[in-house]
Amino acid sequence: DNAKAVLTYCFFIILSGSVANLLLDVDKFMLNFYINIDNIAFYSVAIFIATVIAVPSRAMHQITYPITAKLMSENKHDELNELYKKSSITLQVIGGLILVGILVNINELYSVLPEGYSEGIAVVFLIGISKYFDLVLGNNNSIIFNSKYYRAVLFLGLFLVFLTVSLNMIFIPLYGLNGAAIATLISITLYSLSKLLFVVLKMELFPFTKNTIVA
């Protein structure tokens, strides 16, 4: 029974990771059908710049994942809730500083790139906002992955893929590169809200405090 449970868990985690990787390329794949292929390079560079905002969360998750697992196995709800809040406010501050740093220096950054790449400036802003919103949720993923509701991540991820593809079909023909970024912003925001509500309603954990507004 234990072996079956472990294999089932690994299966869902691997599938969830595959969905996440798919999302990294779905925009660029769909742009091929609507705009000049040369412009996709502008989008790729903009995505790369905006993704820098998510770097702190990767380091944070490496630290909080085992701590989260330990607290959940010991049913220490209050300590887990405190960790959730601390991870949220920490990533909010660090991610916010990185986002502001990128946006303040975006024109200088694009001045060293070949002409035409500046078309991706709005993409950097839109994707940056979506990454930042995801950061503010702290160790949300760690909590869901270590709970009995870990299957929910896969289903939410599939919902995100469907939503992203649908929104891309609407916004890319209207706004080109910016349309793909708008679709991603809406999709990630709704996905993040879904995870937030899931953790709040199912596990009674909440990442925000009065310091969230101050920060």
Label each PLM-derived region with a short phrase:
Residues 12, 27-31, 41-61, 89-90, ...:
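Alpha-helical transmembrane segments of polytopic membrane transporters and translocases
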Residues 37, 102-132, 138, 178:
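Interfacial segments at transmembrane-helix termini and the short loops linking adjacent helices
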Residues 46, 50-88, 141-146:
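Helix-loop junctions and terminal segments of transmembrane helices
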Residues 7, 44, 68, 76-105, ...:
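Interfacial transmembrane-helix starts/ends
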Residues 1, 139-143, 185-215:
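C-terminal transmembrane helix end/exit motif
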Residues 1-24, 63, 67-82, 202-214:
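Interhelical loop/hinge segments that connect adjacent transmembrane helices in multipass membrane
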Residues 128-159, 199-203:
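Membrane-interface junctions at transmembrane-helix termini in multi-pass inner-membrane proteins
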Residues 151, 158-193, 205-206:
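Membrane-interface helix-loop junctions in multi-pass transport and translocation proteins
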